[in-house]
A protein has these predicted regions:
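Membrane-embedded transmembrane helical bundles of large multi-pass transporters/channels
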Residues: 2-184
Length: 184
């Protein structure tokens, strides 16, 4: 018997096994995110808006990789749970701050803007440092690691933007007529 082994064959097997688990991995990460959001907010909007936002961030991230013509490998599969895990943090902080400001005003848009204003510096610094850390992979001699760094950096930026813009827009759109329950 003869055995053939090469890096290309091993990479192919690893990629195939990983792709088969992609759906399960994303579903598990999403379920963990939903559980954390439910514990944090205990209402449908508090859970649904960040989930929508993070899924849009993932669509943008993987779409960006596709537009660049980047070959989808096992490392890119790991982008989804990492972006979900990092992005949920932005959503939780913003929604907590929004809830505090919502108790002081009937204007939903004003409450969201105050929340964003209060957290703009700390969240921006968190995003910048995280993106810089992921972009450090660009100096790697291994092309898949460079691609992984680009994907994660772009994913974090997308998660931040969708958390600040999309979640805010959803709150303004679907809470416009509501008055804060604690102010009634």
């Amino acid at each position: 018997t003869y055995a053939v082994a090469s890096l290309d064959l091993m990479s192919y097997d690893i990629d195939q096994g990983t792709f088969e688990n992609l759906t399960l991995l994303i579903l598990f990460a999403t379920m963990v995110v939903i559980a954390l959001l439910f514990v944090a907010f205990r209402n449908v909007k508090g859970v649904l808006f960040p989930v929508i936002s993070l899924n849009v961030a993932l669509i943008f991230t993987y779409g960006f990789l596709n537009i660049l013509g980047i070959k989808f490998t096992a490392l890119e599969v790991a982008v989804a749970p990492l972006v979900l895990g990092l992005g949920i943090d932005y959503a939780i902080h913003l929604q907590r701050s929004f809830a505090c400001h919502r108790n002081n005003t009937d204007d939903v848009a004003e409450a969201w803007m105050r929340a964003c204003g209060k957290l703009s510096v700390p969240l921006s610094l968190a995003v910048v440092t995280t993106v810089a850390a992921f972009l450090a992979n660009l100096v790697s001699p291994l092309p898949p690691l460079s691609t992984f760094g680009i994907a994660l950096a772009f994913g974090v930026i997308c998660a931040f933007l969708t958390s600040t813009l999309l979640i805010g827009a959803l709150h303004v759109t679907f809470n416009a007529g509501a008055i804060s329950t604690e102010r009634k």
